[in-house]
Amino acid sequence: MNNLVAEPTSVASTQGIRVTVRSVYLPDQSSPDDNRYVFAYTVAIANEGTDPAQLRTRHWIITDGNGSIDEVKGPGVVGETPRLAPGQSFQYTSGCVLTTAVGTMHGSYQMYRDDGERFDAVIAPFTLAAEIASGDRLMN
């Protein structure tokens, strides 16, 4: 894959909503011999704007090392639809299983303002990359 970002971290801001993501490889839950690579990612969503906003839906685009794409859409995150007042933040951790040692994720959260305005808060691309024994990340 030529379009992998170099870091397992991403940051994006949209209309005062900052989304920061960091991914980690979970070797104890993975089984490379079975093409099973497990990753966790932690997302921090911060309202740096002047108006409250509520996260209503998520849209993830997950691309594995072979270029196969999986889209995930649904209400909220980890069973919640957090409403963030100015200065507030929300953090959660979730996971992803790939059949390749590398991949990427990106997407958006649909946010609603109190006045009914809707916008998509961008989740910038970040890398999912298994680590070899030396701790170096695998890259194609």
Residue ranges of predicted features:
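Membrane engagement elements in two modes
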Residues: 1-38, 50-56, 63-140
